């Protein structure tokens, strides 16, 4: 890069653990983005007060201190990067980089260096450890010589972090020369007073600034009393209690539901809160849109004038979701995202769709897509590799819907299914306006109708782009030999493709003669004197036979009952892809087959129960099924509220 340097796999150290990401150091400052989206650190060059290098195990750590006292630590630089970046900081920012050394002697006595809001424990001239005073929640004097620092403990944590720092004790003898005391004010008291003057100790207190009772939260599900304190928010429910520091709040979303008296308010967190083994990066709240509240903020006049005068008012009266968002924004400093220019066919802000096995609504926003309510899925435009519009392979009522596949640069895919067909013009126009790559309509863009050429094709024999793409990807990996490790039930019909098991009709599953390549009959010798017209006639006859065979499929036939393995595959496939990025199509089937084979009868029971219920459903539907006469399929002008 001529303007700076770009590095991948650089971790940011923080109270919630380490987060990998990408850092850009350029003439305007420093920009770090977390891998997979979430937290972003943007430091302007005018805010940089100092830069340090430290050699840590296996790599190098870059420390950047800014004007407000914060210190960011970026780890993962090579030795050759140290030289190039040191010269860059000197030549571009005019900053001389300081080199720090890490103490590895194991001594627990030394001196304390207080700089900004950082406390560094020094052993000789080397640093043993460093903590941020912004994370200190309380200080206590124990006896005459001991000071205990208590750190903020909340329910946010890194995905791989099991432990967090709760408290630390310092022993300051009366003979200490750095913090000199007297008989009435010992050295430990001098040290504690110094910490309290630098740390934001006690901010937030025990009293809430404002409380919202009986708020419905969809993720994590429950009804909670939401308390907004000065430095954190608390969710108090009957079974759960979450405390969340405002430093973990990345962004707020205010998204109305179309034709329904509810509004979503989403709090995006980094790091997320944890409940058991489940991480919740998004708190999804649902407010009644027409509810009006009158709230007074419990903030002292002095504190309000000194810190919050430009951010908050002392009293609010208005719609509950607007009051909640305004107060939370003022306290946390988080930005609020609202719906942008997209409008559905009913002039709403979202479209109905399904993700995995869950029905919900998809919000196309100015810089992202957001699927709600469960599982809440945020997809940033900058992380998208391409999108595909996919028509359903079956006919009948399914022709009123299409799917939207979003593939990320990380090769992860999100398939939003069963979107009403009369929404595709709005979606196509919106996606095109954002400059996102659309894979399967590059040729159709130049023709009249554009995406309509793909989605409005009523030919039941048309190719499903998603299914065809999966087959093409799998074709290069499949071998001629049968995989003996892949053992399934006789009626499974093989490993299903992504999300295909729930949507294919009975005709498409049972039509083995049309799915398998037909055996080629030996060609008969043709007379050299045969006219070309006879050859064309013969070819036409062959094509006619093939088309007649294809028409044996009935798109209106009931969906065939799925086996227990098919239900198991649908549940496990996405998890398998997440834990094994880049796994091939055939390996997915093999691993799922092995997992199914190793399950006990008790573990298979819930899947077999679903299979029995589906079998009964199929039996009931097929018993009353009659092959209908051909009929015209309506283009689909009806629409449900998004």
UniProtKB/Swiss-Prot annotation:
Tree of life domain: Eukaryota
Keyword terms, alphabetized: Chromosome, DNA damage, DNA repair, DNA replication, DNA-binding, Nucleus, Transcription, Transcription regulation
UniProt subcellular location: Nucleus; Chromosome
Record field: compositional bias (Acidic residues): 475-486
Chain positions covered by the region annotation Disordered: 470-566, 598-642
Entries under CDD domains matching the protein: HMG-box_AtSSRP1 (cd22013), PH1_SSRP1-like (cd13230), PH2_SSRP1-like (cd13231)
Biased composition (Basic and acidic residues): 513-527, 598-623
Cross-referenced Pfam families: HMG_box (PF00505), PH1_SSRP1-like (PF21103), POB3_N (PF17292), Rttp106-like_middle (PF08512), SSrecog (PF03531)
Residues of the DNA-binding region: 558-626
SUPFAM superfamilies, A to Z: HMG-box, PH domain-like
UniProt entry tagged with the keyword Iron: no
GO biological process, one term: DNA repair
GO molecular function, one term: DNA binding
Compositional bias per record (Polar residues), positions renumbered to this chain: 629-642
Cellular-component GO terms for this entry: FACT complex
Keyword Cytoplasm: no
Function: Component of the FACT complex, a general chromatin factor that acts to reorganize nucleosomes. The FACT complex is involved in multiple processes that require DNA as a template such as mRNA elongation, DNA replication and DNA repair. During transcription elongation the FACT complex acts as a histone chaperone that both destabilizes and restores nucleosomal structure.
Family statement drawn from the similarity comment of this UniProt entry: Belongs to the SSRP1 family.
Subunit text: Component of the FACT complex, a stable heterodimer of SPT16 and SSRP1.
The protein's name in its UniProt record: FACT complex subunit SSRP1
Gene symbol of the encoding locus: SSRP1
């Amino acid at each position: 890069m001529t303007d700076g340097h770009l590095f991948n796999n650089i971790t940011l150290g923080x109270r919630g653990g380490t987060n990998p990401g990408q850092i850009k150091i350029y003439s305007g400052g420093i920009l770090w983005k977390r891998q997979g989206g979430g937290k972003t650190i943007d430091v302007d060059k005018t805010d940089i007060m100092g830069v340090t290098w430290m050699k840590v195990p296996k790599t190098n750590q870059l420390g950047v201190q800014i004007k407000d006292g914060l210190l960011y630590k970026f780890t993962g630089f090579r030795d050759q990067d140290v030289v190039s970046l040191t010269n860059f900081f000197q030549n571009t920012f005019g900053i001389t980089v300081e080199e720090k050394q890490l103490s590895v002697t194991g001594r627990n006595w030394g001196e304390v260096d207080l700089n900004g809001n950082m406390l560094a424990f020094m052993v000789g001239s080397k640093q043993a450890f460093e903590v941020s005073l912004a994370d200190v929640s309380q200080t206590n004097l124990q006896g005459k010589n001991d000071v205990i620092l208590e750190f903020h403990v909340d329910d946010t944590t890194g995905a791989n972090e099991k432990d967090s720092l709760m408290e630390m004790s310092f022993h300051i003898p009366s003979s200490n020369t750095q913090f000199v005391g007297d008989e009435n004010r010992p050295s430990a008291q001098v040290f504690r007073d110094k910490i309290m003057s630098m740390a934001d100790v006690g901010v937030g207190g025990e009293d809430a600034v404002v409380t919202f009772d009986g708020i419905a939260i969809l993720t994590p599900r429950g009804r909670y009393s939401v308390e907004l304190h000065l430095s954190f928010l608390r969710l108090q429910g009957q079974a759960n209690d979450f405390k969340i520091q405002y430093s973990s709040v990345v962004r707020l979303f205010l998204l109305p539901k179309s034709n329904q008296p509810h509004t979503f308010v989403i709090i995006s967190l980094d790091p997320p809160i944890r409940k058991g083994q489940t991480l919740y990066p998004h708190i999804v709240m649902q407010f009644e849109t027409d509810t009006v509240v009158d709230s007074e903020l419990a903030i002292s006049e002095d504190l309000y004038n000194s810190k919050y005068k430009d951010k908050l008012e002392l009293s609010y009266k208005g719609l509950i979701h607007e009051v909640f968002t305004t107060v939370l924004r003022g306290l946390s400093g988080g930005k609020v995202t609202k719906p942008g220019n997209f409008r559905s066919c009913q002039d709403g802000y979202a479209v109905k769709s399904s993700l995995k096995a869950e029905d919900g609504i998809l919000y196309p926003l100015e810089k992202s897509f957001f699927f709600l309510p469960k599982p809440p899925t945020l997809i940033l435009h900058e992380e998208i590799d391409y999108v595909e519009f996919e028509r359903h392979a079956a006919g009948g009522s399914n022709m009123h819907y299409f799917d939207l596949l979003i593939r990320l640069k990380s090769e992860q895919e999100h398939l939003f299914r069963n979107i009403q067909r009369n929404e595709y013009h709005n979606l196509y126009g919106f996606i095109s306006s954002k400059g996102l790559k659309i894979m399967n309509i590059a040729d159709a863009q130049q023709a009249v109708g554009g995406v309509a050429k793909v989605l409005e094709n009523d030919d039941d024999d048309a190719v499903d782009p998603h299914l065809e793409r999966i087959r093409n990807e799998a074709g290069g990996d499949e071998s001629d030999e049968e995989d003996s490790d892949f053992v399934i039930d006789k009626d499974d019909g093989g490993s299903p493709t992504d999300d295909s098991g729930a949507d294919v009709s009975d005709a498409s599953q049972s039509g083995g003669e049309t799915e398998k390549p037909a055996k080629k009959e030996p060609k008969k010798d043709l007379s050299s004197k045969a006219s070309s017209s006879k050859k064309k006639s013969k070819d036409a006859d062959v094509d006619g036979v093939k088309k007649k065979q294809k028409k044996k499929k009935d798109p209106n036939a009931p969906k065939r009952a799925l086996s227990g393995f098919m239900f198991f595959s649908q549940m496990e496939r996405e998890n398998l892809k997440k834990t094994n990025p880049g796994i091939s199509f055939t390996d997915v089937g093999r691993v799922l087959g092995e997992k199914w084979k190793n399950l006990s009868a008790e573990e298979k029971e819930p899947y077999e129960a679903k299979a029995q219920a589906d079998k009964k459903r199929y039996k009931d539907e097929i018993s009353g099924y009659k092959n209908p006469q051909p009929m015209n399929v309506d283009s689909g002008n009806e629409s449900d509220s998004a």
